[in-house]
């Protein structure tokens, strides 16, 4: 079995550290990547960390993960609330997917309360800040053990 975990980040997450630090905190996406790589290594995973602002690229990465990864952590950003394409891409693969959000989407604007991705994912972690990514890695370790 593969030990690869692909961490996929959607639109605007490249702006972490600058964008609304009161909501998302001060960590950059690179900081979160470092946390994931280190935590993943401790769990026996090789973590590949990616970000794109383009929905089709995220779909392609999910398809790729279905071919070669043990699991996926995805923060779809705003696509969570609109993307049937991401929902369908997750349903198309057997690789377990954990959805992550830095903020608690249920405590924010009403349009953020519903995720189109969640029904297709194994589970969702939200509201724990950047540590949610590490939590997702631990969940995948449990799921894939």
UniProtKB/Swiss-Prot annotation:
Active site per UniProt: 24, 101
Pfam family, one: DHquinase_II
Documented EC number(s): 4.2.1.10
Class of the enzyme per the UniProt entry, highest EC level: lyase
GO MF entries: 3-dehydroquinate dehydratase activity
Source domain of life: Bacteria
Pathway: Metabolic intermediate biosynthesis; chorismate biosynthesis; chorismate from D-erythrose 4-phosphate and phosphoenolpyruvate: step 3/7
Chain positions recorded as substrate binding sites: 75, 81, 88, 102-103, 112
Catalytic activity: 3-dehydroquinate = 3-dehydroshikimate + H2O
Annotated site (Transition state stabilizer): 19
UniProt keyword terms in alphabetical order: Amino-acid biosynthesis, Aromatic amino acid biosynthesis, Lyase
Listed GO biological process terms: amino acid biosynthetic process; aromatic amino acid family biosynthetic process; chorismate biosynthetic process; quinate catabolic process
Record keyword Lyase present: yes
PROSITE patterns hit by this protein: DEHYDROQUINASE_II (PS01029)
Function per UniProt: Catalyzes a trans-dehydration via an enolate intermediate.
NCBIfam families for this protein: aroQ, PRK05395.1-2, PRK05395.1-3, PRK05395.1-4
Record text on subunit structure and interactions: Homododecamer.
Family, similarity comment: Belongs to the type-II 3-dehydroquinase family.
PANTHER family: CATABOLIC 3-DEHYDROQUINASE
UniProt protein name: 3-dehydroquinate dehydratase 1
Species, as recorded: Agrobacterium fabrum (strain C58 / ATCC 33970) (Agrobacterium tumefaciens (strain C58))
